[in-house]
C-alpha cells in the first residue's frame, strides 16, 4: 500500500537543497501577490532557469516562480490550480518537469562541486580545466573531464608507469609526425632486464613499446573529446545484438525468448519493450546482449583524432588506438549505452504504467448506491457482501454455483432475499474465475431488471484483502470478505478504493519488475496525487489512505483527521481542520481547496474555491446586491459579475475564471458519467469465439505495441498496434486508453498456443495467421490462459499484465527483424 508519498519526500529534499544553496526569500503564500520577485531577487541559478525555460518553451520568470513555490513547500496540484498567475498557467506536467529538471541540475552542481574540491585538494586544478568544469552542463561531460584525474585502481598503464615507461610514451606522442624517428631504438633505452625490483623490470624492446602503448591507450580512453565522439558514434551507429547462449536453444523456458535467439536492431530505434524483453532474457540466463558500432569505424575514429601522420611513431599510436577501443573505451561505452538505453526504456515503461494507472483511477464511479458485491469462484464458492451507500458492510455469506439443484436454489434464494432486504441498487461481480458463469446465473434468477449487473476488475483485490489497511477496516472478517468488499467499493468509487492498493498490484504496467523501482514509485505516487486532487476529497467520509494523498497532507495528518472526526463528529467547516493536531497553516493552505464538506456551514466549503478567496467571492455577491447562497444558486446573478473589475495585484483573470467556473458547478466531479457495460451473451470462453465475430470489450492494458482487451472469455485478446485503426498508429495510447469501451473483431483464435488476436479496423483481415514457430516465436503472442482466468494476480506471474510471463515477451517481440 502506498503510505509514504515519494513526492513529499522529494519535496522535503527540494526544500532542504533550496534553503542551503538557493537562499530563497520568504514570501507568504497565504497572501499571494502578482508582484513576484525577479529571478535575480530570488537568487536562483539563472543559467538553470533559462535552460529549463528553453526546454519547456515557457518564460524564465515562470520557471523561477515554480521553483520558488516548491522551495516554500507547495505541491504540484496546489501550484497548478491556485498559483496560475505566478506560473503563467503551467499545467501539472510542466510544473513536474520544472521540479525534476531542477533536481537534476542540482545533482550536476553537487557533482561539480565535489570534482572541483577533489582537484583542488590534489593541486590538479588549472584555470583552463576549471573553466571547462564550470561550463559542463551534464553529468556525462563532468565525468569525462574528470576521467584523467580520477584516482585509479592498478591498471596496465599504471604498471607501465611504475616501470618508468611514461617518458617513452611521451616521446612517441611528441615524435609521431617525424618519419625519421625510431621508436624501437628509443625503446632500447628503457630495457631493464636486470632491475632489482621485479615491478621495474623491462625485459626487452617489445615490452617497453607495449607498456608505452598501454599508457597512450589509457590517455585516449580518458580524453574527453575522444569519449564524446565515441559516444556519438555509439548513439548513431550502435547496434543491439542478441544471441542465445550455447546449450540453451532447446530449453523449454528459453522458448519465450526465441525471437531474440539471433536478433539485431539499431540502438537508436529499438522500442523500449523490446529492449526490456532482451534484457530480461539476459538476466534469466538465456540470451547474451551486446551493444556496439562497426569496429572499423570505432578504431578509425580514435586513430583519426590521435594522429594523421604516416611514420613509425604514428604506427605505435594506431596500435594503441585499436587496443584502447577493444580493451578500454569500447567496453566502457558499451556499459554506458546499456545503462542509457535501460534508462530510456525505463522512462517509457514507467510513463505507460502511469498513463494506464491514471485512466483506471479516473474511471467513472457508480456513486453512492447500495451495492451487492460478488467475488466469484467454483470450488470455494462465491463470496457475497452487501454494502450501504457509504460503502459500509451490512451482510456477508457464501453461495455455491456447482453441485445439486438444491444448492443452486439456495443460492438463488439468498441473493433474492439480500437484494430485497438491503434495497440493492447494483451488483458488482469480480472478473476472475467463474465470473461469466456467475453473471449468467445472476441474470437468470429473476432479479429486478433495473438493477444493473456489472463486471469489475478484481486486480489487486487479493493484495488489499491481506493488507494492514484491510485488517484495520475489517478485523473480524477474513480475506475473502475483504476482497469482496473491495470489488463492490471499486464499482462505487474506483479512486477511493484503489488508493489502498499498491499500484504495481493493479496490473496495468509494462515490465514493472524490471524498471527502476524508485523511478516507478515516484511516478506512480505523482499520478495518484494528481488524480486524487483533481477529483477532490469529501472530508467527512474519506479514508485515511485517500486523505494521505491530498495536497499538503501526509499519513500522520490523515490519521489525525480521522481520529478527530471519530472523536468530534463530522467537520462543519474547512477552518475546523486547524484544530486537528499537528496540522498547521501551511498544510491547511495546501490542502483546503481540495477538500469538500457536503453539508458545510459555509457554501464555498462544498466547492474547489480556496478559502483565501472567500472574501473575494463574498465581495462579488455584495457588489451585485445579493447573498452568497443566491449568487451560487442563480445563474442570472453570476452573469452580472464583471471579472475584470476584480483583477488586482493579488488575483488575475485565470484565477477569477476558475472561481466563476466553480461557482457555476460547485464541487463538480471531472470524471465521466457511469455507463453500464455488458459483454456479448453466449460468449464466455475462448472456445465460443469465431473468426469475424464482432464483440464489445474493455481495454485492460495499453502498451507501445498494442492494447489488451477483455472480451469476457477469461482471457484478454491483443489488438496489435497495426490493427488499432485504418490509419497508421505510432503509439497505441494515441488511440485507446485503459477502461475504454471498444468494439473489436476476432481475427485469430489459437487455442493450443492460447492466443486471441483482435482488430479495431473497419475492414479487418480475417485470414488465419500462420505461426512462424513454436510458442514464443513471432505472430504477436497473447496473454496465456491461467487457472485464475487470465485475470491479473499479485506479483509478476503469468496472470499479471506486464508483470512477467511469456505472453508479454511474445507480444512485445512482434516486429520485423
Description of each model-found segment:
Residues 189-195, 205, 302-306, 311-325, ...:
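Low-complexity, acidic/Ser/Thr- and charged residue-rich accessory regions of DNA metabolism proteins
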Residues 78, 94-97, 104-373, 379-477, ...:
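Duplex nucleic acid-engaging cores and interfaces of nucleic-acid transaction enzymes
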Residues 752-769:
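OB-fold/S1-family single-stranded nucleic acid-binding modules
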Residues 42-48, 106-124, 472-570, 590-616, ...:
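Long, highly charged, low-complexity intrinsically disordered interaction regions
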Residues 34-64, 71:
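Generic start-of-chain signal for non-secretory N-termini
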Amino acid at each position: 500500500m502506498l503510505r509514504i508519498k515519494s513526492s513529499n519526500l522529494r519535496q522535503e529534499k527540494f526544500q532542504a537543497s533550496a534553503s542551503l544553496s538557493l537562499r530563497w526569500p520568504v514570501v507568504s503564500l497565504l497572501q499571494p501577490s502578482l508582484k513576484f520577485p525577479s529571478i535575480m531577487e530570488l537568487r536562483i541559478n539563472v543559467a538553470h532557469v533559462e535552460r529549463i525555460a528553453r526546454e519547456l518553451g515557457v518564460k524564465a520568470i515562470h520557471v523561477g516562480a515554480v521553483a520558488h513555490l516548491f522551495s516554500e513547500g507547495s505541491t504540484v496540484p496546489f501550484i497548478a490550480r491556485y498559483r496560475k498567475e505566478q506560473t503563467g498557467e503551467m499545467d501539472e506536467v510542466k510544473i513536474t518537469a520544472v521540479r525534476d529538471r531542477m533536481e537534476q541540475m542540482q545533482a550536476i552542481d553537487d557533482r561539480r562541486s565535489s570534482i572541483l574540491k577533489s582537484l583542488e585538494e590534489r593541486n590538479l586544478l588549472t584555470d583552463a580545466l576549471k573553466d571547462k568544469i564550470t561550463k559542463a552542463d551534464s553529468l556525462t561531460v563532468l565525468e569525462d573531464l574528470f576521467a584523467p584525474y580520477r584516482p585509479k585502481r592498478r591498471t596496465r598503464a599504471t604498471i607501465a608507469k611504475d616501470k618508468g615507461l611514461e617518458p617513452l610514451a611521451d616521446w612517441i606522442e611528441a615524435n609521431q609526425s617525424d618519419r625519421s624517428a625510431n621508436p624501437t631504438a628509443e625503446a632500447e633505452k628503457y630495457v631493464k632486464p636486470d632491475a632489482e625490483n621485479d615491478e621495474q623490470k623491462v625485459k626487452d624492446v617489445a615490452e617497453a613499446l607495449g607498456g608505452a602503448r598501454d599508457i597512450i591507450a589509457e590517455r585516449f580512453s580518458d580524453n574527453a573529446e575522444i569519449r564524446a565522439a565515441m559516444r556519438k558514434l555509439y548513439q548513431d551507429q550502435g547496434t543491439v545484438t542478441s544471441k542465445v547462449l550455447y546449450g540453451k536453444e532447446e530449453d523449454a523456458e528459453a522458448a519465450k525468448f526465441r525471437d531474440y535467439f539471433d536478433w539485431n536492431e539499431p540502438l537508436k530505434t529499438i522500442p523500449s519493450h523490446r529492449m526490456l524483453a532482451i534484457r530480461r532474457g539476459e538476466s534469466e540466463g538465456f540470451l547474451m546482449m551486446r551493444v556496439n558500432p562497426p569496429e572499423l569505424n570505432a578504431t578509425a575514429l580514435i586513430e583519426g583524432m590521435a594522429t594523421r601522420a604516416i611514420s613509425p611513431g604514428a604506427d605505435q599510436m594506431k596500435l594503441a588506438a585499436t587496443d584502447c577501443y577493444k580493451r578500454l573505451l569500447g567496453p566502457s561505452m558499451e556499459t554506458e549505452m546499456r545503462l542509457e538505453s535501460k534508462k530510456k526504456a525505463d522512462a517509457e515503461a514507467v510513463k505507460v504504467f502511469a498513463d494506464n494507472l491514471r485512466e483506471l483511477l479516473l474511471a467513472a464511479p457508480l456513486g453512492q448506491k447500495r451495492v451487492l458485491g460478488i467475488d466469484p469462484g467454483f470450488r470455494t464458492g462465491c463470496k457475497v457482501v452487501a454494502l450501504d451507500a457509504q460503502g459500509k458492510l451490512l451482510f456477508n455469506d457464501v453461495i455455491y454455483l456447482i453441485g445439486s439443484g438444491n444448492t443452486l436454489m439456495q443460492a438463488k434464494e439468498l441473493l433474492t432475499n439480500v437484494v430485497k432486504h438491503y434495497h440493492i441498487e447494483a451488483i458488482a461481480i469480480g472478473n476472475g474465475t467463474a465470473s461469466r458463469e456467475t453473471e449468467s446465473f445472476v441474470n437468470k434468477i429473476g432479479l429486478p431488471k433495473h438493477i444493473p449487473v456489472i463486471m469489475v476488475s478484481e486486480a489487486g483485490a487479493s493484495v488489499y484483502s491481506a493488507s494492514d489497511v484491510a485488517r484495520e477496516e475489517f478485523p473480524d472478517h477474513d480475506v475473502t470478505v475483504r476482497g469482496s468488499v473491495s470489488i463492490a467499493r471499486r464499482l462505487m468509487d474506483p479512486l477511493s478504493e484503489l488508493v489502498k492498493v499498491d499500484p504495481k498490484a493493479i496490473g496495468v504496467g509494462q515490465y514493472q519488475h524490471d524498471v527502476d523501482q524508485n523511478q516507478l514509485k515516484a511516478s506512480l505516487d505523482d499520478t495518484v496525487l494528481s488524480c486524487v486532487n483533481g477529483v477532490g476529497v469529501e472530508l467527512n467520509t474519506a479514508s485515511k489512505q485517500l486523505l494521505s494523498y491530498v495536497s499538503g497532507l501526509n499519513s500522520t495528518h490523515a490519521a489525525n483527521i480521522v481520529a478527530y472526526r471519530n472523536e468530534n463528529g463530522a467537520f462543519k467547516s474547512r477552518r475546523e481542520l486547524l484544530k486537528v493536531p499537528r496540522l498547521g497553516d501551511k498544510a491547511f493552505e495546501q490542502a483546503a481547496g481540495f477538500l469538500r464538506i457536503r453539508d458545510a456551514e459555509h457554501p464555498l466549503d462544498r466547492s474547489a474555491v480556496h478559502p483565501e478567496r472567500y472574501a473575494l467571492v463574498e465581495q462579488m455577491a455584495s457588489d451585485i446586491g445579493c447573498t452568497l447562497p443566491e449568487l451560487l444558486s442563480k445563474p442570472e446573478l453570476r452573469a452580472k459579475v464583471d471579472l475584470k473589475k476584480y483583477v488586482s495585484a493579488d488575483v488575475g483573470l485565470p484565477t477569477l475564471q476558475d472561481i466563476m467556473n466553480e461557482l457555476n458547478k460547485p464541487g463538480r466531479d471531472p470524471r465521466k458519467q457511469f455507463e453500464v457495460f455488458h459483454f456479448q451473451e453466449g460468449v464466455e470462453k475462448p472456445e465460443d469465439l469465431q473468426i469475424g465475430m464482432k464483440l464489445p470489450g474493455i481495454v485492460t492494458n495499453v502498451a507501445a505495441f498494442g492494447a489488451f482487451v477483455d472480451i469476457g472469455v477469461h482471457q484478454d485478446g491483443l489488438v496489435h498496434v497495426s490493427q488499432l485503426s485504418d490509419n497508421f498508429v505510432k503509439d497505441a495510447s494515441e488511440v485507446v486508453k485503459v477502461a475504454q469501451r471498444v468494439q473489436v473483431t476476432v481475427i485469430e483464435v489459437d487455442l493450443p498456443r492460447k492466443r486471441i488476436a483482435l482488430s479495431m479496423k473497419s475492414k479487418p483481415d480475417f485470414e488465419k495467421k500462420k505461426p512462424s514457430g513454436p510458442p514464443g516465436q513471432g505472430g504477436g503472442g497473447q496473454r496465456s490462459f491461467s487457472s485464475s482466468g487470465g485475470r491479473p494476480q499479485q506479483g509478476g506471474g503469468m496472470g499479471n499484465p506486464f508483470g512477467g510471463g511469456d505472453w508479454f515477451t511474445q507480444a512485445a517481440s512482434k516486429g520485423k527483424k
